[in-house]
Swiss-Prot record:
It is found in: Cytoplasm. One of its GO terms (molecular function) is 3-isopropylmalate dehydrogenase activity. NAD(+) binds at residues 77-90, 290-302. The gene is leuB. It is an enzyme of class 1 (oxidoreductase). This is 3-isopropylmalate dehydrogenase. Belongs to the isocitrate and isopropylmalate dehydrogenases family. LeuB type 1 subfamily. GO terms for biological process: L-leucine biosynthetic process. Homodimer. Pfam families: Iso_dh. Mg(2+) binds at D226, D250, D254. InterPro entries: IsoCit/isopropylmalate_DH_CS, IsoPropMal-DH-like_dom, Isopropylmalate_DH. Catalyzes the oxidation of 3-carboxy-2-hydroxy-4-methylpentanoate (3-isopropylmalate) to 3-carboxy-4-methyl-2-oxopentanoate. The product decarboxylates to 4-methyl-2 oxopentanoate.
Amino acid sequence: MTARNLFLLPGDGIGPEAMGEVRKIIAYMNEAMDAGFVTDEGLVGGCAYDAHGAAISEADMQKALAADAVLFGAVGGPKWDSVPYEVRPEAGLLRLRKDLQLFANLRPAICYPALASASSLKPELVEGLDILIIRELTGGVYFGEPKEIIDLGNGQKRGIDTQVYDTYEIERIAGVAFEMARTRQNRVCSMEKRNVMKSGVLWNQVVTETHKAKYSDVQLEHMLADAGGMQLVRQPKQFDVIVTDNLFGDMLSDVAAMLTGSLGMLPSASLGAPDGKTGKRKALYEPVHGSAPDIAGKGIANPIAMIASFAMCLRYSFNMVKEADDLEKAIANVLDKGIRTGDIMADGCRQVGTVEMGEAILAEFKALSA
């Protein structure tokens, strides 16, 4: 069997605790399923800065580049608030995204039936919610040049950011969206601001042309991004796959995340382009939540987002679709049984810590995969 190489970067805060529960699942899969996972581990974020003076070392960067997939925990915390900007903990994640050329960020917003009452919206609006937001990750206003603050004199300054998209960047992210839609409900909604932004005009044109040329079997809708934000909280279940640029994707995916009730529940994936020879994509998987330094080391963090990120890894990097389905079903089954970490605790449920939640999910996964 060909080895499946995983590089683990637990990071800071609750990252190591959540990653610990994924390690148990990997060990079980190797033992019971002969899955062939080979794991290595490195430092990223604040802990890497403490050890190496950088948010990720060159050696660990090379290991990430060589791996089939990277599992990432979380970075940051008040301890590193005063470090130089270029070596801040978050710079490690940005370096990974850049060097791995990860242009497509996949953010599922799934509301488990057992948690519908935890959403800020009415349960009937979110129960059964299953949206996939696909955000372009390497272009747009976050990376466009010029990006600077100019001193105009007389006490006045000017901040400049530049929104830039080329045709190929839009084509490839649209292609990912249409391909993902084919495995779901076959619907894509593209969001931009073509009414006020030239980049939005081009985005709309290129998505439309890509759809017509290669993906006419998929239903395509266009929506202005501000209207899309409104519709996400008005009638979220109307959406299947949403594709949008870096800035709007950053905002809309966080809006969608809170429809589900807890950031501690949500995974994400960042994918690169398929390799010309093997067809494999570089990929990084991470929970949406941050490092939560206030609860780090207390054993109470919710590991579900990290475990669900590993399920995405099984699906998209290793084509282990049944195993991914089983792991996601295991999470749902545990929630149906009323087992909760503190962040999603509700009346009548049983509160557990990180390890007990992880072990409950593993037990369900074992039963489903037996």
